[in-house]
């Protein structure tokens, strides 16, 4: 039976379009399920983000040159940073990519002029200290690492993943047994009610 992992991909938006796309592609090519609200929304509700991380098996962070959009109720922390912290709090296996300075220089942004540059550097340092982190210069490197890492994670028994119904043949049998037990239970309840009435 083949287990598909749900993989939450977190990154800033504008500076990492290609890297994020490459990560999604690598997850799909490895036969798993990419997730991440940034795949659909630039800004979204915390409840949706939490649910998406909770339902995921693995969390991937990609750090580029921007710290990211800050939270509405706490401007000292970006959504990306908050997602990273939350995934850690709920015990998700995490790994990260840091795009090298050389690769960032090829992008049409002056990252040091952007706001929160120092916060980004502090965030990078904490990520490097806490979880497996890979420096990457191109999208091919991201894809290779994701293939290797997900192969390792797929073998872990503590990660539930997703299974296709057709890969779980006993499910149909369980449905039938459950329906039979429900019918039997209803019949016994009816008999019990009848016995109560006759004994009164």
Predicted segments with their positions:
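Conserved N-terminal substructure of TIR/SEFIR domains
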Residues: 1-62, 90, 172-200
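Solvent-exposed loop/turn segments at secondary-structure junctions
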Residues: 14, 42, 66-68, 101-104, ...
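Extracytoplasmic/secreted cell-surface and envelope-processing proteins
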Residues: 18, 69-71, 105-107
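Hydrophobic anchor at the start of a short beta-strand
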Residues: 34, 94, 133
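Conserved TIR/SEFIR loop-to-helix hotspot centered on a Trp-containing motif
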Residues: 40-45, 66-90
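Generic beta-sheet signal
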Residues: 62, 97-99, 136
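A short helix->loop->beta-strand "cap" motif at the edges of active sites that frequently abuts
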Residues: 89-102
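C-terminal interaction surface of TIR/SEFIR-family domains
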Residues: 105-195
């Amino acid at each position: 039976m083949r287990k598909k992992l749900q993989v939450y991909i977190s990154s800033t938006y504008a500076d990492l379009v290609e890297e994020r796309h490459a990560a999604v592609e690598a997850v799909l090519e490895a036969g798993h399920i990419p997730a991440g609200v940034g795949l659909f929304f630039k800004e979204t509700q915390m409840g949706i983000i939490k649910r998406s991380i909770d339902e995921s098996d693995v969390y991937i962070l990609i750090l580029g040159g921007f710290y990211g959009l800050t939270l509405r109720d706490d401007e000292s922390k970006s959504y990306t940073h908050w997602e990273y912290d939350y995934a850690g709090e709920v015990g998700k296996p995490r790994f990260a990519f840091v795009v090298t300075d050389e690769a960032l220089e090829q992008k049409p942004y002056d990252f040091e002029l952007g706001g929160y540059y120092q916060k980004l550097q502090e965030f990078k340092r904490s990520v490097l200290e806490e979880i497996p982190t890979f420096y990457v210069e191109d999208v091919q490197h991201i894809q290779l690492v994701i293939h290797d890492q997900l192969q390792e994670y797929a073998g872990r028994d503590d990660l539930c993943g997703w299974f296709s119904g057709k890969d779980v043949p006993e499910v149909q049998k369980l449905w039938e047994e459950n329906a039979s037990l429900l019918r039997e239970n209803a019949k016994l309840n009816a008999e019990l009610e009848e016995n109560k009435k006759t004994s009164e």
